Amino acid sequence: MSLLTEVETPTRNGWECRCSDSSDPLVIAASIIGILHLILWILDRLFFKCIYRRIKYGLKRGPSTEGVPESMREEYRQEQQSAVDVDDSHFVNIELE
């Protein structure tokens, strides 16, 4: 006899738990924690690049450019953009001789 037939059996209304302790507060808390863990894991996998960049570089966009000439600001923006573009690439070309 399998574990599935001992614990849960399909009925016409859906899956029914045959455990007598299913109303135990510990079981309910464990179920809620499990569901929250699953939701957080899914969100982490969906937004990991955004989340970890935010942690790594902080909430600021970069160092302050107050008092810096506009030409240097533009050069800095281009450098930062090229660094982000390189970081987003998923493949590296390796040429063998």
Curated annotation (Swiss-Prot):
Which chain positions have S-palmitoyl cysteine-type lipid attachment? 50
What protein is this chain from?
A: Matrix protein 2
Q: Family membership, please give it.
A: Belongs to the influenza viruses matrix protein M2 family.
**Where in the chain is the site Seems to be involved in pH gating?**
41
According to its record, how does it sit in the membrane?
Answer: Single-pass type III membrane protein
Q: How is its activity regulated?
A: The M2 protein from most influenza A strains is inhibited by amantadine and rimantadine, resulting in viral uncoating incapacity. Emergence of amantadine-resistant variants is usually rapid.
Q: Name one GO cellular component term.
A: host cell plasma membrane
Q: Which residues carry this modification: Phosphoserine?
A: 64, 82
Compartment(s) where it occurs, according to its Swiss-Prot or TrEMBL record:
Virion membrane; Host apical cell membrane
Annotated segments matching region Disordered: 60-84
Task: Tell me the domain of life.
Answer: Viruses
